């Protein structure tokens, strides 16, 4: 299981621990990943994602999972998120055709 946010693509970063004597040792900065179920308003169901806390804030800032997926470019999303996005677009097209 990789340590990458499924919605934002945020992953691990490499840096240094720096001592008082300015000695540098390699270290890794990991994103704060949480397993969450995000609800889709248009599909009326929940989807499980492994998301960073920054990603959760971004989703809420954009008005929910549906708006976030529609605004985000495909290359930033995981395969799981892309499946949900395709399903969402399909449901929206069917709703437009029925109306």
UniProtKB/Swiss-Prot annotation:
GO molecular function, one term: structural constituent of ribosome
GO biological-process terms attached to the record: translation
Keywords assigned: Ribonucleoprotein, Ribosomal protein
One Gene Ontology CC term in the entry: cytosolic large ribosomal subunit
Gene3D superfamilies: Ribosomal protein L28/L24
InterPro entries: Ribosomal_bL28, Ribosomal_bL28/bL31-like_sf, Ribosomal_bL28_bact-type, Ribosomal_bL28_sf
Positions of transmembrane segments: none
Family: Belongs to the bacterial ribosomal protein bL28 family.
Entries under NCBIfam families matching the protein: L28
PANTHER family assigned to the protein according to its UniProt record, in alphabetical order: 39S RIBOSOMAL PROTEIN L28, MITOCHONDRIAL, LARGE RIBOSOMAL SUBUNIT PROTEIN BL28M
Full protein name: Large ribosomal subunit protein bL28
Species: Erythrobacter litoralis (strain HTCC2594)
Lineage per the UniProt record: Bacteria, Pseudomonadati, Pseudomonadota, Alphaproteobacteria, Sphingomonadales
